Regions:
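Adenosine-cofactor binding site in Rossmann-like domains, unifying the SAM/SAH pocket
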Residues: 57, 65, 69, 288-299, ...
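Class I SAM-dependent methyltransferase Rossmann-like catalytic core
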Residues: 1-24
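A structural motif corresponding to the C-terminal end of an alpha-helix
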Residues: 258-259, 280-292, 333-342
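Long, positively charged, glycine-interspersed low-complexity recognition regions
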Residues: 321-393
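Class I S-adenosyl-L-methionine-dependent methyltransferase module
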Residues: 46, 50-287
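Conserved proline-anchored active-site loop of SAM-dependent methyltransferases
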Residues: 13, 19, 29-43, 54-59, ...
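Extended, basic/helix-rich recognition subdomains
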Residues: 188, 192-196, 200-207, 214, ...
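Conserved phosphate-coordination/catalytic loops
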Residues: 6-14, 231, 291, 321-325
């Protein structure tokens, strides 16, 4: 399947072709919450509009798209460390979106446990430098994806041994560790859960107390209950240490478990895959008809004979320029529009009507849940939409 735009959390990449098919021809095309620019990318390929405007209140988004089209990343080879990421993410859009977890522009893409391995893989593939792999005890000059797929046990064993010795400062019997690993992980999970429960009891606290302390709603149930159990993140764990009796450092109690879970896809190097997406954008043309803006959606002047597309932040999830998005203000703005306005969302007020819906799997969800993505227009534009579609036939 062709990929559109650049890697971005919540990207409409998988739905771009279906969504753009809904739009009638017009002179101008506005993508007011452009994000990863997947919709604009598809619209440019279809070439049914004379002028294109990409806008996002986060200036990094439209800039990254245009930089990619202009070939800025043709010779990009940098390895971005965790420290580099947090120093550069606010000023370097490539770093922010191609080196962040889930392409969210906020958190570094690799856990601390797997970062040394990913760095070694990057050096081997990009710089043909195998010295870091040699440090792990992996003696090879072939770190292709295929070689790694064919030698997973050897690599895991040597990397775990290196990590435990050099990072955890622990000597482990790796062969013994690998026996019945699934059962060991399951048993260890229960021991970790019991460790958290004991800390709660020693402190005379209840899960609801933890929720109040963390400012969460029911998350404590995942830490102390059996249903959908999960261990706190390092940040949350270290915060909990100030509230309940959790004596062991995070790395000691969970470091090995996190390492084992991180090693499931050794051959993958997500940063290079993201870079390849950017490089493919160089083939786009019609740049002279593409305008970049960085404003609030309601500050954009919409010209006559236009199509407006809005992929708004969903309620209870994303922020808008680090602020809560005012959905009511947006709904009122839509009702005033005279040019056709299309909105992607799961639900909208009764003044809007759904013109299409698509089954969509959210890969960023811990449950990989299927959702129904809908495209709406304001009800007062329904007759206009039908007329414009008829004119295109």
């Amino acid at each position: 399947m062709k990929k559109y735009g650049f890697p971005y959390k919540g990207s409409k990449n998988k739905l771009a072709e279906k969504i753009v098919k809904l739009f009638p021809d017009a002179e101008n095309f506005y993508d007011l919450f452009c994000g990863g620019c997947a919709i604009t990318h598809r619209a440019l390929i279809e070439d049914r509009w004379k002028n294109y405007v990409i806008n996002d209140i986060d200036s990094r988004c439209p800039k990254l798209f245009l930089d990619a089209i202009n070939g800025k990343f043709k010779n990009e080879t940098r390895w971005i460390s965790r420290e580099d990421f947090y120093n550069l993410k606010d000023t370097d859009a490539y770093v922010a979106f191609c080196w962040s977890f889930g392409n969210n522009g906020k958190g570094y893409m690799y856990s601390k446990e797997i970062e040394p391995y990913k760095k070694a893989l990057h050096y081997a593939r990009v710089f043909n430098d195998f010295s870091l792999f040699n440090d792990f005890g992996v003696k090879t000059s072939d770190c292709s994806r295929m070689w790694i797929i064919e030698h997973p046990d050897e690599i895991k064993q040597k990397y775990i041994l290196w990590y435990c010795k050099n990072i955890l400062h622990s000597e482990l019997d790796i062969l013994e560790l690998q026996k019945n690993l699934t059962e060991k992980v399951k048993k260890n999970n229960e021991e970790l859960r019991q460790y958290l429960i004991n800390g709660l009891k020693k402190s005379n606290k209840r899960p609801c107390d933890v929720d109040r302390f963390l400012g969460t709603n029911g998350m404590a149930g995942h830490y102390f209950g059996k249903s959908q159990w999960e261990f706190p993140t390092r940040e949350v764990y270290e915060k909990l240490q100030t509230f309940i009796c959790l004596e062991k450092p995070y790395l000691e109690i969970y470091g090995l478990q996190e390492l084992l879970e991180s090693l499931q896809s050794l051959q993958s190097l997500q940063s290079l895959e993201s870079l390849e997406r950017l490089e493919r954008l160089q083939s786009l043309e019609r740049l002279e008809r593409l305008e970049r803006l960085c404003k609030s959606y309601d500050e954009i002047e919409i010209k006559p004979n236009s199509i407006i597309y809005c992929d708004i932040p969903y309620k209870g999830t994303d922020k808008y320029n680090n602020l809560d998005f005012d959905h009511e203000a947006f709904f009122n703005w839509c009702k005033k529009q005279t040019e056709l306005c299309f909105i992607s969302s799961y639900e909208m007020p009764e003044d809007f009507i759904s013109i299409a819906e698509f089954n969509h799997r959210c890969t960023l969800s811990c449950k990989n849940q299927a959702t129904i993505e809908k495209v709406f227009i304001p009800k007062h534009q329904l007759d206009l939409y039908k007329a414009r579609l008829s004119a295109c036939i």
